[in-house]
From Swiss-Prot:
One of its GO terms (cellular component) is HslUV protease complex. This is ATP-dependent protease ATPase subunit HslU. The gene is hslU. Its main location: cytoplasm. Keywords: ATP-binding, Chaperone, Cytoplasm, Nucleotide-binding, Stress response. ATP binds at V18, G60, V61, G62, K63, T64, E65, D250, E315, R387. The lineage of its organism: Bacteria, Pseudomonadati, Thermodesulfobacteriota, Desulfovibrionia, Desulfovibrionales.
Length: 437
């Protein structure tokens, strides 16, 4: 679990998300409270539940990005789901429990990656040994074999044998070649049927020719599987999900009916009632066992243009005690987004075109013009926040991106005149629908 303080968490989030200080502080405290809870006496620890959060704000202001970066910082299993994809029990569609099952799968993969990294050196050593056995026939004498083996090993480590082919036995998963296509809303049943076939049909072994570098990767995976205790892995993942998991429920406002339409939206209220036991704490059956949701952190988000949090059923409102409103982005924020974050769009395009030996640079007046244009379009059409910058940048750099392979060594400076020239055909055009993502 992350030991970062709230101030350190906010500082890390500032590297990727511009503004929205109140939201950053709120989620930072939520993560720190998890660390604090782990240091409580066991009898009190179970009584402390996470304070779930509702983020309110228009699209493209950083709601999802804050939650995603927060999960990476804390090393927590994280999943984003859309509330509109779920249906009330009894209707065709995904049931709300599927998000917990999906979160558990993410937790399994997260812990498996950590375990594979932990045993990587031992797995590579075992894989090298098996690879040398494949390359050296048994006809060699003991001393000659040892000497040749050492030389081959050095050549392999230097990459001299990567393109050479070797024939080896590959283990294929059981299942009899049967692919299971799950019916929407019945994914768990599809997984159970697939597991049943996997157990009924033992793994198959086949000989296959492949390049040595590919064979080495296959052998490393096999050896890692032998070194990692799968039962312990599942137990660790279960604990990680139950204690640190984060579920981000987007578009929560779409299932909150306004008072005028409440009578015609029975199914929306049904989804809310199905969500209620998951959010307040219950047990969900997965193929890895029962998962308790009591201490999973739920972060809900929505624009709330046509509804408000008070339109949700009272029981669900009470399970999201913390609420924060994210502000719409303007020219100043767009300029900061283009310059400040570690993954700023300008840095991404400079790196992308740098692979074609093109030196791309942006002047401050050029960036200011881009920011002003983004604000203008957002005010005249749908406000999609920072996502507007993606469309504008693609429009500005479309010709360069297309011609890049034919102009290696070129130096391109994107200044105000360059931006105006490439956007002049749409600046006065009232039909800007092509710029709405």
């Amino acid at each position: 679990m992350s030991t970062l303080t709230p101030r350190e968490i906010v500082a890390e989030l500032n590297k990727f998300v511009v503004g929205q200080e109140q939201a950053k502080r709120m989620v930072a405290v939520a993560v720190r409270n998890r660390w604090r809870r782990q240091h409580l006496p066991s009898d009190l620890r179970d009584e402390v539940s996470p304070k779930n959060i509702i983020m309110m704000g228009p699209t493209g202001v950083g709601k999802t990005e804050i939650a995603r970066r927060l999960a990476r910082l804390s090393g927590a299993p994280f999943i984003k789901v859309e509330a509109t994809k779920f249906t009330e029990v009894g209707y065709v569609g995904r049931d709300v429990e599927s998000m917990v099952r999906d979160l558990m799968e993410i937790g399994i993969n997260l812990v498996r990656d950590e375990e594979n990294a932990r045993v990587r050196k031992a797995a590579e050593a075992a894989a090298e040994s098996r690879l040398m056995d494949l390359l050296l026939p048994n006809s060699f004498g003991q001393e000659e074999r040892a000497s040749t083996r050492e030389k081959l090993l050095q050549q392999f480590r230097l990459g001299f044998l990567d393109e050479r082919e070797v024939e080896m036995e590959v283990t294929e998963q059981g299942g009899g070649g049967v692919d299971i296509f799950a019916i929407p809303g019945m994914e768990q049943m599809g997984g159970q049927v697939k597991d049943m076939f996997s157990k009924a049909f033992p793994p198959k072994h086949s000989r296959r020719k492949m390049k040595i570098r590919d064979a080495f990767n296959v052998l490393v995976q096999e050896e890692s599987g032998k070194l990692v205790d799968q039962d312990a892995l599942s137990q660790r993942a279960k604990e990680r999900v139950e204690q640190t998991g984060i579920i981000f429920i987007d578009e929560i406002d779409k299932i909150a009916s306004s008072s005028q339409n409440r009578t015609s939206d029975i199914s929306r209220e049904g989804v809310q009632r199905d969500l209620l036991p998951i959010v307040e704490g219950s047990s969900v059956n997965t193929k890895y066992g029962m998962i308790r949701t009591d201490h999973i952190l739920f972060i809900a988000a929505g624009a709330f243009h046509f509804s408000k949090p008070s339109d949700m059923i009272p029981e669900l409102q009470g399970r999201f005690p913390l609420r924060v409103e994210l502000q719409a982005l303007g020219r100043e924020e767009f300029l900061r987004i283009l310059t400040e974050p570690d993954n700023a769009l300008t840095k991404q395009y400079e790196a992308l075109l740098g692979t074609e030996q093109i030196r791309l640079s942006f002047t401050m007046d050029g960036l200011e013009e881009i920011a002003a244009f983004a604000e203008d379009i957002n005010s005249r059409t749908e406000n999609i926040g920072a996502r507007r910058l993606y469309t504008i940048m693609e429009k500005i750099l479309a010709d360069i991106s297309f011609d890049a392979p034919d102009m290696p060594g070129a130096q391109i400076v994107v200044n105000k005149d360059y931006v105006v020239e490439h956007l002049q055909d749409v600046r006065g055009d009232q039909d800007l629908t092509q710029y709405i993502l």
